[in-house]
Amino acid sequence: MAAASVSAASGSHLSNSFAEPSRSNGSMVRHSSSPYVVYPSDKPFLNSDLRRSPSKPTLAYPESNSRAIFSALKNLQDKIRRLELERIQAEESVKTLSRETIEYKKVLDEQIQERENSKNEESKHNQELTSQLLAAENKCNLLEKQLEYMRNMIKHAEMERTSVLEKQVSLERERQHDQTHVQSQLEKLDLLEQEYNKLTTMQALAEKKMQELEAKLHEEEQERKRMQAKAAELQTGLETNRLIFEDKATPCVPNARRIKKKKSKPPEKKSSRNYFGAQPHYRLCLGDMPFVAGKSTSPSHAVVANVQLVLHLMKQHSKALCNDRVINSIPLAKQVSSRGGKSKKLSVTPPSSNGINEELSEVLQTLQDEFGQMSFDHQQLAKLIQESPTVELKDKLECELEALVGRMEAKANQITKVRKYQAQLEKQKLEKQKKELKATKKTLDEERNSSSRSGITGTTNKKDFMKLRPGEKRRKNLQLLKDMQSIQNSLQSSSLCWDY
């Protein structure tokens, strides 16, 4: 520092000493009247724009040796001063750097310490986490074991429950079977008791009837004996009267004639006996039959006239009132057999189309109900398959589902067949209706043509009405209705008037 002060003092002295001649010289240059221009002190070069500081002026003329030495010394002093300043700055910068390095080391040490502390904390935390994870894994293993044990327990409980339920169901079925068997036995016993009571009552009635019949037979036997006695008396009386009459009337008749008469009498008795047995119909007394005055015996819709017709038929020998054997001349056994055959044929007659349609609709309804039940079972099985915990149960349910799908397909085929058959019946019914309509149209056209040709609508008798076919009456009524509708449509309100 002392050297720096000495150099600074010497530099200031030299600068003062150098400054004085320059001032004197400058004054000389300024005050001298010369033809040359003064060279600018701040431009080292004339052809360039470079400028210099006023502390370092440029001289246009060469300096003297002393001045050059002074300028060199001055420059050296400036350099020394600059170097001193740089050294001082360097020392200060070194000091600041040492301070900064110390501070940086402190900061680094603190950061390293913090990192080590954080690492230690992280390691501790990681150790705690690993210990917690191990404890959690142990707990999970224990819970899994407990869960497996609980599953096994639930399976065993379900198996036991199913076995108990199956036993209960089997016992219930056996009990129901026993109950039904006992009930059937009791019903049979009741039926047997009822039949026994019926038989006892029937037996009592039969015994009563037998007693009544025996009494009647006894009475009839007595009556028959009386009649036989009376007949014998009458026969003897008749014989005596005949003999008396023959003796009186023809005393000279030969014996052969008497024999013939005697032979011819027994068949007459037989014919008189068989007369009532061979009656073909009821013979009524004409005096008991009434007569309605003013009524004809022709067929009519009036009830009184029909009564008169019946009375007329009963008075005459009408085959309508005779026995079937008389009319048909067929034995009774054959007639019964023919009636049985007719009844069988009538019983075998096919059912009507309406009954078939009703039966088909009922069958279709039942099939559709069964198909709906199967679809519901299908949905339930699908839910059970989704919720099934084990693979075995899932396989069993899938097998059941496949079987159910097969049954559903078969049921759908049955439904389609029934619907096809129903559609065929509907088509046949429509075709029949079309044919009937065509036939009715033809008959109506024929009737129109016949009515247009004749122009007279005659009234049909009862015999002609009976000769008509079964559908003719309906067709005629339909045609009459159509004609009335056409007449009503053809009439207008203006054409109608009332005559008073």
Curated annotation (Swiss-Prot):
Record-level GO cellular component terms: centriolar satellite; centrosome; cytosol; Golgi apparatus; microtubule; nucleus
Region (Mediates interaction with microtubules): 277-491
Region annotated Disordered, chain positions: 1-34, 43-62, 434-472
Subcellular location: Nucleus; Cytoplasm; Cytoplasm, Cytoskeleton, Microtubule organizing center, Centrosome
Entry keywords, A to Z: Coiled coil, Cytoplasm, Cytoskeleton, Microtubule, Nucleus, Phosphoprotein
Bias-annotated ranges (Polar residues): 18-34, 451-460
Tissue expr: Ubiquitous.
A GO molecular-function descriptor: microtubule binding
Gene3D superfamilies: 1.20.58.90
Transmembrane segments: none
Coiled coil: 63-242, 392-492
Comp. bias intervals (Basic and acidic residues): 434-450, 461-471
Modified residues (Phosphoserine): 53, 55
Disulfide bonds: none
Subunit record text: Homodimer and homooligomer. Interacts with microtubules. Interacts with FGF2 and RAP80. Does not interact with FGF1 or FGF2 isoform 24 kDa.
Task performed by this protein: Centrosomal protein which may be required for microtubule attachment to centrosomes. May act by forming ring-like structures around microtubules. Mediates nuclear translocation and mitogenic activity of the internalized growth factor FGF2, but that of FGF1.
Protein family: Belongs to the translokin family.
Domain commentary: The C-terminal region mediates the interaction with microtubules and is able to nucleate and bundles microtubules in vitro.
Protein name: Centrosomal protein of 57 kDa
